[in-house]
Amino acid sequence: MCSARKLLRGGAGSAGGECDEDGAAPAGRVEEPEHGASPRRRRPQDEGEQDIEEPQNHSGEPIGDDYKKMGTLFGELNKNLLNMGFTRMYFGERIVEPVVVLFFWLMLWFLGLQALGLVAVLCLVIIYVQQ
């Protein structure tokens, strides 16, 4: 019979404290203790192989944009700008977030039209090269 104490301690020769319906240890898996580790401090063999489950939305609401999940400065500033009434700009397939528009206006103010044009051309070249 497999008791709770045997399950917690990995008891009586069973592999990791697992028991089948009869209370006997399963025959296929043998776990050897790590050198110098007590049975309670052993970690399961497949601990590194466990998949990290992503949070799922069970409320029926659509999952929001990535910036709502991130706690980055870009995401938080973008979320605040959207809440204040700034809108996204749509250029065909591309969506320009309000924080990017604000960044370009600040660059235009500080650096002037030539520097803004240079940065815009560099951004377009980077986008073109990535495609």
From Swiss-Prot:
Record InterPro entries: DUF4605 (IPR027953), FAM241_domain (IPR052502)
Stretches for region Disordered: 1-67
Major place of residence: membrane
Membrane recorded as keyword: yes
GO (cellular component) term, any one: Golgi apparatus
Chain segments annotated as transmembrane: 99-119
Topology class, membrane: Single-pass membrane protein
Location within or outside the cell: Membrane
Modified sites of kind Phosphoserine: 14
Keywords: Membrane, Phosphoprotein, Transmembrane, Transmembrane helix
Keyword Transmembrane: yes
Family: Belongs to the FAM241 family.
Protein name: Uncharacterized protein FAM241A
Lineage of source species: Eukaryota, Metazoa, Chordata, Craniata, Vertebrata
